[in-house]
Regions:
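His/Asp/Glu-enriched short active-site or ligand-binding loop at hydrolase and phosphoryl-transfer sites
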Residues: 156-169
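Short acidic/histidine-rich active-site segments
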Residues: 189-203
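Residue-level detector of anion-binding/catalytic polar loops
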Residues: 34-35, 156, 190, 219
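Histidine-centered catalytic micro-motifs
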Residues: 4-14, 38-41, 131-135, 195-197
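Metal-associated gating/positioning segment near the N- to mid-region
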Residues: 13-48
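Extended substrate/RNA-proximal surfaces in nucleic-acid metabolism proteins
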Residues: 29, 42, 47-159, 214-223, ...
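Histidine/acidic-residue-rich catalytic or RNA/ligand-binding cores of hydrolases
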Residues: 15-18, 47-51, 140-147, 167-183, ...
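C-terminal active-site rim and adjoining tail of enzyme catalytic domains
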Residues: 162, 181, 194, 198
Length: 242
């Protein structure tokens, strides 16, 4: 499978990543990607940047080291209604938004129903484009319901390659993805593969994700990574680059 993009990455601005924006873009260019996306953690993540950071993306060149760049965010889902940690004013200024559950940012004692409702609620927000790493058994959800809702609301579900790595802190990712991806095939839900890179060497590292898709015989037509125009159908700012 041709893999042209990586939209879930972090730089030093996120507080626990280790390279600059220019270094990450350089790595993406060297690895032959056609598009690089930077998605810093939104403010509720301990140590991340202030919300004002997301209001000044106009100063950033949209081609860096020869590769087109999108500037987005990884929002934190804060409660079981799907509330997130950047206001609409900021979301309208950025290129795209990923919304994810993170253990430091939400009650860790919820039920499957609670976390499912969190995902379903956030998908009703038209300014959110991708659901990040829906795979963590510490924050379990009804993955079939999540896949069905993503198809209904025209959201991309992320297959996070880092979640599948042996050193990942997320629990049960492969088993959860097997359920989620099976449901995606049932409902025709599109997915995006991302690295979740916090260091330049991991930009575009989608190896674990590709292995899982091959094991499941997942249809390539439901993966947006081989086609920028296919991804642009979910991310309007990308359409403006084509």
């Amino acid at each position: 499978m041709i893999d042209l993009l990586d939209l879930h990455t972090h730089t030093i601005a996120s507080g626990h990543a280790y390279n600059t924006l220019y270094e990450m873009a350089q790595s993406a260019a060297e690895k032959g990607l056609a598009l690089y996306g930077c998605s810093e953690h939104a403010p509720a993540m301990p140590g991340s940047c202030h919300k004002f950071y997301f209001s000044n993306f106009d100063v950033i060149p949209r081609v860096i080291r020869g590769i087109p760049v999108l500037m987005g965010t990884e929002l934190n889902i804060l409660d079981h209604t799907g509330r997130v940690d950047l206001e609409e004013h900021y979301l309208q200024k950025i290129d795209y938004a990923i919304a994810s559950l993170h253990t430091p940012c939400i009650d860790n004692h919820g039920t499957v129903s609670d976390y499912t409702n969190a995902y379903l609620g956030v998908m009703e927000n038209p300014l959110i484009h991708i659901i990040g790493h829906p795979d963590d058994s510490r924050l379990p959800a009804d993955w079939t319901a999540v896949a069905a809702a993503a198809a209904k609301h025209h959201k991309l579900l992320e297959l996070n390659s880092h979640s599948l790595a042996p050193n990942s802190s997320r629990k049960g990712a492969r088993e959860n993805y097997e359920q989620l991806l099976t449901a995606c095939m049932r409902y025709g839900t599109s997915i995006i593969i991302d690295s979740d890179a916090h260091c330049e060497n991991d930009v575009g590292n989608h190896e674990m994700a590709h292995r899982l898709l091959a094991d499941l015989h997942f249809p390539e037509e439901l993966v947006v990574n081989p086609s920028l125009s296919k991804a642009a159908a979910f991310i309007p700012s990308l359409a403006r680059l084509l």
